[in-house]
């Protein structure tokens, strides 16, 4: 898979906001973003539902705190305890009700002056609904043995209701050696 340097432009802000605290990375996968965050001097708590992904992350980035967790369940962090949360393509596996509960958990855990950096599958993705025969709910599909949600701009804005959206842009990245359309956002809790 191609390395994706999407965090580079955000690193100065992440460093400033996370000074003295931890960056929570939801869905760390093999640890590419984790490595970038650690190289920038951040203290990272990397999470993933997959023990295999956590093992890969641990091998590639040995000095990181790892937690196996399901993003669809309540997060094991205190209220308003995290200055930065990064969630790159890790919030699209859930029904809409669970997705909105995740948004509430993100707000609960983030400090009042904290930031959320997130990327979501776009409905303009080249592989939108790939290999799917079953739409479970609008823009949410059964894909082989998993589920996958795709977001249009109104869905991203609904997910971020109660947030001050500082940045929202649709981009094309490379994933699995193919183009992939994603929404990228940076948001802060609204007053």
Stretches with model-predicted labels:
Residues 96-97, 129:
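Conserved catalytic-core motifs of eukaryotic protein kinase domains, centered on the activation segment
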Residues 100-112:
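A short glycine-rich, Lys/Arg-flanked "PGG" loop and its adjoining helix->strand segment in the class I
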Residues 87-90:
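A short beta-strand submotif of the Rossmann-like class I SAM-dependent methyltransferase core
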Residues 75-85:
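A short acidic, Gly/Pro-enriched loop at the edge of an enzyme's catalytic core
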Residues 1-23, 29-74, 117-191:
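Class I (Rossmann-like) S-adenosyl-L-methionine-dependent methyltransferase catalytic domain
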Residues 92-94:
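A short His-aromatic
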Residues 97-98, 179:
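Short, solvent-exposed loop/turn segments at secondary-structure boundaries
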Residues 21, 81, 113-114:
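Surface-exposed loop/turn positions
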């Amino acid at each position: 898979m191609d390395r994706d340097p999407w965090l580079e432009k955000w690193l100065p802000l992440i460093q400033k906001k996370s000074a003295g605290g931890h960056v929570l990375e939801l869905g760390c996968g093999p640890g590419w973003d984790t490595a970038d965050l650690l190289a920038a001097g951040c203290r990272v708590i990397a999470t993933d539902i997959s023990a295999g992904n956590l093992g890969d992350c641990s091998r590639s980035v040995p000095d990181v705190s790892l937690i196996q967790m399901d993003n669809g369940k309540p997060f094991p962090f205190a209220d308003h305890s995290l200055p930065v949360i990064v969630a790159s393509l890790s919030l699209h596996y859930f029904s809409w009700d669970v997705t909105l509960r995740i948004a509430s958990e993100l707000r609960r855990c983030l400090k009042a002056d904290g930031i959320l950096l997130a990327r979501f599958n776009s409905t303009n993705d080249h592989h939108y609904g790939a290999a799917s025969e079953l739409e479970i709910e609008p823009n949410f599909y059964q894909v082989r043995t998993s589920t996958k949600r795709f977001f249009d701009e109104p869905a991203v804005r609904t997910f971020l209701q109660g947030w001050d959206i500082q940045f929202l842009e649709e981009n094309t990245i490379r994933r699995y050696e193919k183009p992939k359309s994603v929404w990228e956002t940076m948001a802060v809790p609204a007053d």
